[in-house]
Swiss-Prot record:
GO terms for biological process: succinyl-CoA metabolic process; tricarboxylic acid cycle. This is Succinate--CoA ligase [ADP-forming] subunit beta. Mg(2+) binds at residues 199, 213. Its EC number is 6.2.1.5. Substrate binds at residues 264, 320-322. It comes from the Bacteria. GO terms for cellular component: cytosol; succinate-CoA ligase complex. Keywords: ATP-binding, Ligase, Magnesium, Metal-binding, Nucleotide-binding, Tricarboxylic acid cycle.
Length: 386
């Protein structure tokens, strides 16, 4: 689950990390009151969307007068922002964050992620923070330092010193960055966050370190333990199909192609998308119905896929725990209930797959069955291309 920048800063502030003072604005009626709450000659207007790259896309504007700030807010609210992390259609700006300007001496980068390979939290640090951190990581990887934290011992002082060792930082700077890294680590543990990113972490001329921008997302499997964080969820920033899928226990990710996929198992779903691309088409989604899909689950899955205006659907099911004849009956019932006006290719394998295939073939519905995944992908791609 993702949250907005201003929400992430509220959490970081609770854990002792300094952030600029700011006010969230939802409508033009709130502008005057919001500006009056910020005691700064410089006001930074920031679009609040669940995507990075806002600075280069015009989503962060520094205003040095009240009129400039009001104009920026007026132009930004309700606009559509397109960044390298959004789709080509961009995301609508429904709220903006007004923040006091800061005296920036130096920009740094610091983040924490769950390192699944090592089963640890990794702290990442660079003295080259800012909007071009991706370029720094790609072109000068030696300027990006990673430190893995053993969960048995937790974050220790030497971890911070290791992060700063080759950065020519003073003892005082190292001490302050170590303190911030330790607080980020604690935040990760206590909130079940899967990522925390501060970019930039700025140093002011007075030597203070402030989180000028922040990003956080959380482990969906642990969010039930944090109702206060779940309340921060902004459904307007999420894809409607993905929200609907989660209500029915389906794992769904919207993509840019035109062939819908319904599969059981994440690995099989990825393989299905790969083979669709291999035959020259693009998948419209990742949809995993899980290992215990019922007729109702299959029906809801079809509804979600069809809401995306796909040109064809490929169903790829391996019957392990789930029997293929039950899935076949679910497919037939779903089609009879909602109707499907696009080509449908089904590949069944595993427990009772012969019976499942026979049920589909004898259903007198417009269903094409395939013997294996390669044949199924080839069939749906070529039918859609005609």
């Amino acid at each position: 689950m993702n949250i907005h920048e201003y929400q992430a800063k509220q959490i970081l502030k609770r854990f002792g990390i300094s952030v600029p003072e700011g006010v969230i604005v939802h409508s033009l009626n709130e502008v005057n009151d919001a500006i009056n709450k910020i005691n700064s000659k410089v006001i930074v207007v920031k679009a609040q969307i669940h995507a990075g790259g806002r600075g280069k896309a015009g989503g962060v504007i520094v205003s040095r007068t009240l009129d400039e700030a009001k104009t920026a807010i007026k132009n930004m609210l309700g606009s559509t922002l397109v960044t390298h992390q959004t789709s080509k259609d961009g995301q609508k700006v429904r709220k903006v964050y007004l923040e006091e300007g800061c005296d920036i001496k130096k920009e740094y980068y610091i983040s924490a992620i769950v390192n699944r390979k090592h089963g640890q939290i990794s702290i990442i640090f660079s003295t080259e923070g800012g909007v071009d951190i991706e370029e720094v990581a790609a072109n000068s990887p030696e300027k990006v330092v990673t430190c893995n934290i053993d969960p048995i011992f937790g974050f220790q002082g030497f971890h911070g010193r290791n992060l700063c060792f080759d950065s020519n930082l003073s003892v005082d700077q190292t001490r302050k960055i170590t303190s911030i890294a330790k607080k980020i680590y604690k935040t990760m543990l206590e909130t079940d966050a899967s990522q925390i990113e501060i970019n930039p972490l700025i140093e002011t001329s007075s030597g203070d370190f402030i989180a000028l921008d922040a990003k956080m997302n959380f482990d969906d499997n642990a969010i039930y333990r944090h109702p206060e964080i779940l309340e921060l969820r902004d459904y307007d920033e999420e894809i409607p199909e993905e929200i609907e899928a989660s209500k029915h226990g389906l794992s769904y990710i919207k993509m840019d192609g035109n062939i819908g996929c319904m599969v059981n198992g994440a690995g099989l779903a990825m393989a299905t998308m790969d083979i669709i691309k291999y035959y020259g088409a693009e998948p419209a989604n990742f949809l995993d119905v899980g290992g215990g899909a019922s007729q109702q689950t299959v029906t809801e899955a079809f509804k979600i896929i069809l809401s995306d205006n796909v040109d064809g659907i490929l169903v790829n099911i391996f019957g392990g725990i789930m029997r293929c004849d039950i899935i076949a009956n679910g497919i037939i019932a779903a089609i009879q209930e909602i109707g499907i006006n696009v080509p449908l290719v089904v590949r069944l394998s595993g427990t009772n797959f012969e019976l499942g295939k026979k049920l589909l073939d004898n259903s007198k519905l417009n269903i094409i069955t395939a013997h294996d995944l390669s044949e199924a992908a080839y069939d749906i791609v070529n039918i859609v291309k005609k």
